[in-house]
Amino acid sequence: WLSCFDNVHLAVERVFGAAEEKPQLKARTEAALELVGMSHALHKRPHEISGGMKQRVGIARALAMEPKVLLMDEPFGALDALTRARLQDELLGIVVRTGSTVVMVTHDVDEAVLLSDRIVMMTNGPAATIGEIVTVPLERPRERVALAEDPTYVHCRKQVLEFLYTRHGHVEKEAA
């Protein structure tokens, strides 16, 4: 099993190895790990780090590729609530610093409203379609605790819940 550094560096070498010198590749790897707060664990192996740290290494590996669009499928789903919140906050900061667009799949309503500028809600089933799109007009940076009572946050959250528990059910019945 590879260390945190080697895990990210392997991907960096594959993508940039032909065009960049070794010192540049090393610097790119270290910068990606620093971006997700993992500089202190460069030489740690998977069995030596937590689940949240493993997620951050995966995010660092993806960000090191300098993607215009970062695709994330339930990236925080298996984490405890505090680790999830910390990584969500880190992701908000990373997006500000890198300017990357993130497309994330999540089943967590609060996560969707906190992290998104737009929420695309899908209908159920194998023939799922776009059910509704909610624009989230919250200012950035976003402060999780302050948002709990923010009327715009509450309104967006309510829109998502209404779709999931009322209109979504209606869409399903029409399709059947």
Identify the residue ranges that each predicted region occupies.
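Hydrophobic anchor residue at the start of the ABC signature
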Residues: 59
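Conserved ABC ATPase signature
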Residues: 45-49, 53
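Signature (C-motif/LSGGQ) region and adjacent switch/coupling loops
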Residues: 5, 42-45
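A short, proline-enriched helix->beta-strand linker immediately N-terminal to the Walker B motif
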Residues: 64-68
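Catalytic Walker B motif of ABC-type/P-loop ATPase nucleotide-binding domains
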Residues: 70-73
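Short helical segment in ABC ATPase nucleotide-binding domains corresponding to the A-loop/adjacent helical element
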Residues: 5-13, 135
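Conserved ABC ATPase "signature" region
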Residues: 16, 20-41, 93
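Conserved H-loop
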Residues: 99-105
